[in-house]
Amino acid sequence: MKFGVVVFPGSNCDRDMQDALQYDLGQEVIMLWHKDTDLSGFATEDCIVLPGGFSYGDYLRCGAIARFSPIMQSVIKFAGEGGKVLGVCNGFQILCESHLLPGALLRNANQQFISKNVYLRGEGDQGRALMIPVAHGEGRFYADEKTLDELEAGGQVIYRYADEQGIVGAAGNPNGSLRNIAGICNKTRNVFGMMPHPERACSEALGNIDGRAILKALFIDKKQPSVRKEAGLVNI
């Protein structure tokens, strides 16, 4: 499996994502610049990643300008053909702005930037809660009741905020997200978005590798051999 990590002006988690995928999980990574439009080197079993940061300075609205960047038209087409797409934090906001995922990410309920470890419960997961960092000012997931019910009915809620014991409730919700939603997918289950940063919890050196479980569960075929290739920015 091959990963393409998109770099927008203002991205600041692109290299974190590269390191997690390439060095911690042994996957092939290609860095993509926001002006790139050719994704013909990626097959539908590959994945394009929209990382965290402040794309285009988050002017107007988080992800609102990045949604119109040259590469996003290709990403939308890639997703429509069944290719895998992951958006983390600002990447999740971009996916919602692009209408690849429903809903919106609003200002945190406490009106403050939040940077801390939180706990996540995967839907249907009976294991322990995963500790994953968040770092956002606009991470409160919102959608109308009809959309929320459709997400629930379709099994599209993939992660919810929880407490350390894995109990989903107000105590574990850092930003006021409706129904404690931390991550969702589309109906065809090839586009995924989440506010927490799994790439920041993949290295033993950081004392937390819970993020590996998330990335592996979403994408990586455990039967395939690991590969390591150097990744560099292209077409800057």
Model-derived features: where do they sit?
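A glycine-centered loop/beta-turn motif at secondary-structure junctions
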Residues: 181-205
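N-terminal beta1-alpha1 cap of cysteine-dependent amidohydrolase-like domains
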Residues: 1-87, 98-102, 108-113, 150-152, ...
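Beta-strand-turn-beta hairpins that frame and shape the catalytic cleft
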Residues: 1, 124-129, 186-191
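Active-site metal-binding loops of divalent metal-dependent hydrolases
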Residues: 53-54, 91, 137, 198
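Active-site-proximal beta-strand elements of phosphoester/diester hydrolases
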Residues: 3, 131-135, 192-195
